[in-house]
């Protein structure tokens, strides 16, 4: 029987499958739908220092091979998360061993630092620093394009945060390997990539862009080969763990990222199509491994390089 256990930053996870931020709430919403013993961790809904309502107008738009979203980081704020939602995540961890990851966005360096400092004193296992959100007008992806800007904000957060720090990168980065090296040098413990790809949709009946911000984030199967290429580049550029995400919907998809060198993977849009997607992906990975005589993921991690 294949063993999917995965070590990420010292945490032994049930599997390499992590629920991507913004697609599984804080985990508890999925508890009755999925077998959490198959899930390695949950990255909670993206947080900002102060709660915000998110974007107005249309927020989701399906494409033939994916989903475009413009949520705009709607969230209750860091303090509310610490007081309420984090407790639910930690209960899941106690029951199933799922690693609790807090995804932190921001509109300025100061907001990132203050939010990270608050999370540093909480019970979260990992802080996922989101410098790559394409759906907010200020901050967010502004730090995810240029390596110098990314390195600076990561360095400031590193000084304020005692937790393991995973930096979530944008596919819009000018140079993926350079960006990865910059955040590693600034103190990142791990990298997750890639966030959604900036996209656009037109409503033919209204004869105008679907989203008020015009551009929004594309995820789903359409982006997977590009995300895989970026993960390949990242693994070759740094010595810290790389968590791959982008269009993973099957066990074979996840195994491609593992063979490219990813330590773990995140599953996002697939959760909207199938609430049991993470569990199913883990089962499919194990079935493939059993069929090919592979006992652990370490035997094939990075084997394609």
Which positions does each model-derived feature cover?
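N-terminal capping/small domains of soluble enzymes
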Residues: 1-100, 106
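Surface-exposed amphipathic alpha-helices with a cationic face
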Residues: 7, 11, 82-95, 120, ...
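Alpha/beta enzyme core
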Residues: 32, 107-243, 249-267
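Short gly/pro/ser/thr-enriched loop/turn and capping motifs at secondary-structure boundaries
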Residues: 48-53, 133-136, 198-201, 272-274
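C-terminal helical cap(s) of enzyme catalytic domains, especially alpha/beta-barrels
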Residues: 54-64, 202-216, 258, 270-295
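Small/polar glycine-rich anion-binding or flexible loop at a beta-alpha turn
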Residues: 248-252, 274, 305
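A short, charged, Gly/Pro-tolerant segment at domain boundaries
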Residues: 298-305
């Amino acid at each position: 029987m294949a063993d999917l256990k995965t070590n990420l930053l010292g945490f032994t996870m049930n599997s390499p499958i992590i629920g991507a931020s913004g697609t599984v709430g804080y985990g508890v919403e999925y508890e009755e739908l999925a077998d959490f013993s198959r899930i390695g961790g949950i990255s909670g809904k993206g947080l900002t220092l102060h709660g915000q309502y998110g974007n107005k107008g249309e927020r989701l738009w399906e494409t033939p091979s994916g989903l475009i979203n413009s949520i705009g980081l709607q969230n209750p704020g860091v303090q509310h998360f610490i007081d309420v939602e984090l407790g639910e995540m930690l209960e899941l961890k106690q029951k199933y061993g799922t690693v609790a990851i807090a995804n932190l966005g921001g509109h300025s360096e100061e907001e990132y630092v203050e939010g990270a400092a608050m999370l540093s004193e909480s019970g979260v296992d990992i802080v996922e620093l989101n410098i790559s959100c394409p759906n907010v007008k200020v901050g967010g992806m502004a730090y995810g394009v240029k390596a110098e800007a990314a390195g600076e904000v990561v360095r400031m957060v590193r000084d304020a945060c005692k937790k393991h720090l995973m930096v979530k990168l944008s596919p819009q980065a000018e140079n993926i390997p350079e960006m990865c090296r910059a955040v590693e040098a600034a103190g990142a413990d791990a990298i997750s990539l890639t966030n959604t790809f900036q996209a656009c949709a037109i409503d033919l009946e209204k004869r105008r862009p679907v989203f008020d911000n015009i551009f929004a984030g594309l995820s789903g199967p359409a982006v997977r080969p590009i995300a895989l290429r970026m993960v390949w580049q990242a693994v070759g550029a740094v010595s810290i763990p790389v968590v791959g995400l982008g269009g993973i919907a099957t066990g074979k998809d996840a195994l491609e990222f593992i063979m490219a060198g990813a330590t773990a993977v995140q599953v996002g849009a697939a959760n909207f199509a199938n609430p049991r997607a993470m569990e199913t992906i883990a089962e499919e990975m194990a079935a493939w491994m059993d069929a090919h005589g592979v006992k652990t993921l370490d035997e094939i991690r990075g084997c394609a390089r």
